[in-house]
């Protein structure tokens, strides 16, 4: 925003996967949001989104910060503009804006949870591998792909599948 003269609309880019180690991390996006809102000559903020989503935690941090900044700067409107894709966590972020715009061909939405893994129990037995895993502490071998899935692991993922989308809906 350096060198911007006169009233203008600030632009914050959200491109690619939303994750702590990506360009679209909460730290990077939040820093850009703060600069955009704090700039005295910015009259509004555009979130230009092209992201398939990613970490619900990172997206939640950004969502919360947009809400906080909107309260602190109520005169500055936030507009989410989705280009090719604004799915999952990216749509969650867009939901914090005053208005959302997208092209009729944009992919928008896809709120939910995907979690996958593999179970190798039969393969291990078939090729004669005897795996030894030594742990201390509860849940240290949680989601280990080699033994049969425990009932608690399935119940855990069921709770994640139910609770994470609910966060999107209630915020």
Predicted regions: what they are:
Residues 1-76, 85-171:
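Small-residue-centered hinge/linker elements
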